[in-house]
Amino acid sequence: MSETQAQGVQSPGQVASTSYQPRPARKQVTQAKFDAIREAFSARPDSAGTFNIWYENFAGVDREENEAQKAKRETRCDIARDSGYTRADITLKTQAARIQQGAPVAPDEAVYCCIHFARGCCPHGAECNFLHRLPRPNDYPSQGRDCFGREKLGNYKDDMSGTGSLSKVNRTLYVGRIHEEHGVSSPSAPANSAWRDGGKTLKGGRSIHDVRNKNGPRPRQDPKSYRPQHNSVRPETDNATERVVRRHFSEWGEIDRLRVLTGRSCAFVTFKYEANAQFAKEAMLNQSLDHNEIINVRWASDDPNPAAQKRNQEQMRRAGERAIMAGMSEQAIQAQQALRALEGLEHQRGEDADSKRRRISHQSYDEDMRRLEEENERGWVEFAQERQAAVAAAPTSQAPSAASSASKNNITGSLLNSETMSHLASLQNLDQKQGGASDTYPPPVSSNGLGSLAGYGSDSEDDDS
């Protein structure tokens, strides 16, 4: 097979493979070994009843006992050694040629990854009809199937296993039963007994300061890149366990976040893309890390942290936009870009008009304020000039009046001044006028109580007269 076939071709929603060398895929196991693994995997226990296709186990078998009896897998995928081109790459090339000719490609013709390759037990190698490589971000735009072509369920199973839910994009895996590395913060660390009493030195033991000095100074952490883990006071233990988990899971794709719960023997691994999480779940199920533990890999439930929920919603929105853009044709993309350019131009024009209007209003406002300030300055200058003129004219008007009053006082030569004498004269004239008026008018009528009776006449007196 040529190098062009090895590199693969593009198809609707799929990207050509470039992460592996142009070589045929290696057969991971022989056909006999594969048959033995399949027979052991589907073996029916003696006390088992009907096989439940939902929970993928037999009825009548205790769940805890069944989980404890799960042994470590005999095979494991090695991406650097096992990946290569298969018949699926030829299928991708054929689909790309059909698309260039204008023929549509049905969704059921999509090419998926090999699940046996992910588990490390594919006996076909280059003759396999599935891809022997890691999935790409936009390889599988359909949310109804996983990267292996299996249909998703409407909701998660009770034990969070299986293919996942088609109503949610889950990129986080729960990894349980991991072996925690020993460190300062580990419960089984030798130095833990030295500071369980609050840092006080025990009899014949060491203090917390001795432990810190022995381990050396703490390395400086970058606040932008370092993320403190849950239930952790020092980064040494987190880094020790985190390095092990990251080394084993980073082989299956780019890791976005990793959180190790110290003292609980579990971790949460969040991949950047959901397809990588699906591949890692099948590749690491019932595997071991650096020790003989058998880890339990399941889908993680929703994070109750509001910040995490907001971040997941934003990532889902961006992923939806990328999926829509991947399914659009070049003409539709160009039309959308032109429409956005026109909208941006109209928005810029609107902003220019608004800025011009604001600039004109600011200029008129500044002009009015300058005119008011000039008028105020002129008014204050005129007021100051008028006040100075009034102050200068006041002494000249007061001097003649004082001289005239002094001359009048000298002429009279009496104890009373001229003003008092004029008032007395006016009072005398008023008294004389009132006396003359009393001579012309008749005398007033008496106002006693008998006056009305004296003027009363009876009818008998009129008759006598």
Swiss-Prot record:
InterPro entries the record matches: Cwc2/Slt11 (IPR039171), Cwc2_RRM (IPR034181), Nucleotide-bd_a/b_plait_sf (IPR012677), RBD_domain_sf (IPR035979), RRM_dom (IPR000504), Torus (IPR032297), Znf_CCCH (IPR000571)
Chain intervals with Basic and acidic residues compositional bias: 207-225, 346-355
Zinc finger (C3H1-type): 113-135
Nucleus listed as a keyword: yes
Region entry Disordered, spans: 1-28, 181-241, 346-371, 391-465
Residues in coiled coil: none
A Pfam short name: Torus
Sorted UniProt keywords: Cell cycle, Metal-binding, mRNA processing, mRNA splicing, Nucleus, RNA-binding, Spliceosome, Zinc, Zinc-finger
Source organism, top-level taxon: Eukaryota
GO biological process: mRNA cis splicing, via spliceosome; positive regulation of cell cycle; positive regulation of RNA splicing; spliceosomal snRNP assembly
Free-text comment on this protein's domains from its UniProt entry: The C-terminal RRM domain and the zinc finger motif are necessary for RNA-binding.
Family: Belongs to the RRM CWC2 family.
Protein name stated in the entry: Pre-mRNA-splicing factor CWC2
Protein species of origin: Mycosarcoma maydis
Gene expressing this chain: CWC2
